[in-house]
């Protein structure tokens, strides 16, 4: 009997799906296609060609793709190789709580079959609370139960606005996660004119004041410009005890940072060093001033003041920033002060936008404030492997350094 199956058909977006086909002709070659429309109607598609075994069966966990968007054994390849129909599209889940991404799997040419898989960014029982207290704007995701839960602030970068999908997944794993907006949202400034660290301290205090949040410290997960801010929080805010910085910088760039009476002026950028590739996208990697330059020392973040643990997640094919160099400078700075509270995980072939696993690589996209698309980099196969491994390491890091009371076995995990 012919059958196309995907198990589980409904799951968290960071869970793998087992795809199988039965009832084909022996050694038959077939095409599998995945397609998805985001909430704005943008289409993303992938496909791969497979040969059934002598029993007429196909199992993506052990059978290699012969061609298409990837080659070899990649059980989740149809998911992470999804590509936008329109150039420079980025797949972002906007509505986290009430609707999944629906991915359609199609088998053809003969026989034809189709099924749908649901990919959720939150789990049953998770609560979403809109936060509009004082100056703080965001969305707090609470796991089911009374808690207390380890708290995490979630920061994205120059895209601005409020992105909630990573916070929703963190809540599904037992963390209370505050997706925090800091510009281009609600009544916040439309452009990032400065980084006001007092705002982020207000958010940390608000999170810790919630009755379901474990005290005395919180974590931060951050990427790109957000990771620059996340590192500043680790340096200056005693509330922050565990920080993940994904492809960020170790100094202040673009706009000044203010905290109480302190002002850090930004290191200048040199836009004349911009490179535009054949697709019309911009590579910014070589545009930044060097934090090691004596004139820029006042802009370097004092990482030696950080009291908590810091994990740098680095994609070595980052086309936006020389993120490995920045992380190495930060770790050297720690070591020169006799500190050992930071470490770096390097991922060859991974680009700038390292996301939760099984999401597609975004090699380049349009972003706020730039007239041309920006290059993020990444090799699809290596980037997918990096996202899977990095997410495991991030969850393990927060369980080890934040959630000891909640997950008593976490130090051995």
Locate predicted features.
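Short, solvent-exposed beta-strand-terminating loops
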Residues: 251-259, 343-366
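Ser/Thr-rich low-complexity repeats and stalk/linker segments
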Residues: 34-85
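Glycine-rich His-Gly loop
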Residues: 154-158, 224, 315-316
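Catalytic active-site module of serine/aspartate enzymes centered on a nucleophile-bearing elbow/loop
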Residues: 360-413
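Cap/lid segment of the alpha/beta-hydrolase catalytic domain
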Residues: 135, 147-209, 216, 255-258, ...
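Serine-hydrolase catalytic core
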Residues: 281-353, 386-392, 399-400, 405
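N-terminal cap/lid segment of alpha/beta-hydrolase-fold proteins
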Residues: 2-12, 17-26, 43-46, 51-53, ...
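Primarily recognizes the serine-hydrolase "nucleophile elbow" in alpha/beta-hydrolase
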Residues: 161-165, 201-272, 283-295
């Amino acid at each position: 009997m012919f059958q196309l199956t995907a198990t589980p058909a409904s799951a968290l977006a960071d869970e793998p799906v087992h795809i199988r086909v039965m009832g084909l002709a022996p050694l038959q070659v077939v095409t599998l296609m995945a397609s998805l429309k985001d909430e704005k109607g943008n289409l993303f598609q992938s496909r791969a060609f497979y040969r059934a075994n002598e029993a007429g069966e196909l199992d993506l966990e052990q059978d290699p793709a012969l061609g298409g968007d990837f080659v070899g054994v990649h059980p989740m390849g149809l998911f992470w190789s999804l590509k936008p129909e329109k150039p420079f599209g980025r797949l972002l889940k906007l509505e986290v709580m009430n609707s999944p991404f629906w991915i359609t799997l199609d088998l053809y040419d003969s026989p034809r079959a189709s099924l749908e898989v649901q990919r959720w960014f939150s789990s049953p029982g998770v609560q979403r609370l809109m936060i509009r207290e004082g100056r703080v704007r965001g969305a707090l995701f609470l796991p089911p139960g009374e808690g207390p839960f380890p708290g995490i602030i979630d920061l994205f970068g120059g895209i601005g606005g409020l992105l909630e999908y990573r916070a929703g997944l963190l809540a599904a794993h037992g963390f209370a996660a505050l997706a925090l907006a800091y510009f281009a949202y609600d009544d916040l400034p439309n452009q990032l004119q400065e980084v006001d660290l007092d705002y982020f301290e207000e958010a940390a205090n608000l999170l810790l004041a919630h009755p379901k949040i474990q005290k005395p410290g919180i974590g931060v997960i951050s990427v790109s410009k957000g990771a620059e801010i996340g590192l500043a929080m680790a340096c200056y805010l005693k509330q922050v005890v565990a920080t993940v910085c994904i492809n960020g910088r170790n100094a202040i760039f673009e706009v000044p940072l203010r905290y109480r009476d302190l002002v850090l002026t930004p290191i200048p950028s040199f836009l004349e060093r911009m490179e535009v590739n054949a697709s019309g996208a911009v590579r910014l990697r070589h545009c930044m001033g060097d934090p090691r330059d004596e004139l820029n020392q006042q802009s370097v973040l004092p990482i030696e003041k950080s009291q908590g643990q810091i994990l740098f997640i680095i994609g070595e094919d980052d086309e936006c920033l020389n993120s490995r160099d920045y992380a190495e400078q930060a770790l050297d700075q720690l070591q020169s002060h006799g500190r050992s509270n930071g470490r770096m995980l390097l991922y060859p072939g991974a680009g700038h936008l390292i996301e939760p696993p099984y999401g597609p690589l975004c090699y380049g996209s349009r972003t706020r404030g730039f007239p041309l698309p920006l290059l993020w980099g990444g090799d699809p196969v290596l980037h997918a492997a990096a996202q899977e491994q990095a997410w495991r390491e991030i969850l393990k890091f927060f369980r080890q350094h934040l959630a000891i009371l909640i997950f008593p076995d976490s130090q051995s995990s």
